[in-house]
């Protein structure tokens, strides 16, 4: 295989990268995903969210080492397995970070991460109906507040207000603190995972190839330049080459694992 870009991991980041890179029709992109397809009613259906979260087909089921401060208990570390990654198994809660958090990141040295820098990207990715000037309306990820018809919904918010907390009309605008309705990345009754919002449209263009069940062993180098990856599908080993870049987007646990197997970082 020879491609311009190889994206290792078809999760939340990998789906977006494949979409954006694939906007150039002259570029060929390979996406390698260790899990399978996200096309399943239990992934699509918001009310079934606990099923993929607790199914090894969709969740790697990782755990921490025993924690001394928790009486030796192991902590679950949910990691999405399959196209869309953790966006295919999470709770679909659409809540931006507080603007002051981003300002603090900038103050601590994370150049380019202040609120005014990240806001355009929040706006670019979302499609909100009836939102304010801080919201996006034409993005690929559909956002809504649900039906909100259960009387307990309003009772819970009213109880918070009665206890002295502010009422927030929308926690993704200026009033973050307090009680209010929560938005969800759900469109037409279906989970808006990164695979649905970004990868599927990219695949339809014809210049993005996706291989599922592809377990990447290591990155291949020519000197200090990454030139490809060594991976296996159904225990059959294969190699893929990239003329421009190899992108690791396999998550916070598996990306460094692949790097270590590739001879980068501290010895295992």
Annotated model-derived regions:
Residues 1-123:
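N-terminal glycine-rich phosphate/pyrophosphate-binding loop and immediately adjacent elements
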Residues 9, 130, 205, 256-258:
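Alpha/beta-hydrolase superfamily serine-hydrolase fold, recognizing
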């Amino acid at each position: 295989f020879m491609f311009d870009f190889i994206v290792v991991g078809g999760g939340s980041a990998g789906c977006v990268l494949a979409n954006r890179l694939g906007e150039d029709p002259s570029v060929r992109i390979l996406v390698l995903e260790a899990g399978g397809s996200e096309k399943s009613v239990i992934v699509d259906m918001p009310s079934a969210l606990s099923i993929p979260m607790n199914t090894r087909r969709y969740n790697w089921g990782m755990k921490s080492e025993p924690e001394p401060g928790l009486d030796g208990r192991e902590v679950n570390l949910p990691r999405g397995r399959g196209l869309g990654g953790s966006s295919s198994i999470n709770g679909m809660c659409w809540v931006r970070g507080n603007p002051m958090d981003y300002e603090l990141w900038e103050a601590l040295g994370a150049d380019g991460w202040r609120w005014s820098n990240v806001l355009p990207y929040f706006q670019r990715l979302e499609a909100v109906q009836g939102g304010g000037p801080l919201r996006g309306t034409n993005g690929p990820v559909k956002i809504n507040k649900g039906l909100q018809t259960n009387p307990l919904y309003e009772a819970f918010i009213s109880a918070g207000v009665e206890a002295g907390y502010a009422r927030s009309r929308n926690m993704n605008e200026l009033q973050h603190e307090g009680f209010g309705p929560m938005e969800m990345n759900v469109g037409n009754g279906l989970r808006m995972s990164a695979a649905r919002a970004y990868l599927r449209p990219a695949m339809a263009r014809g210049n993005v190839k996706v291989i599922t069940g592809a377990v990447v062993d290591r990155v291949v180098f020519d000197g200090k330049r990454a030139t490809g990856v060594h991976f296996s599908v159904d225990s059959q080993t294969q190699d893929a080459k990239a003329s421009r870049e190899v992108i690791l987007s396999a998550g916070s646990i598996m990306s460094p694992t692949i790097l270590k197997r590739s001879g980068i970082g501290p010895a295992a």
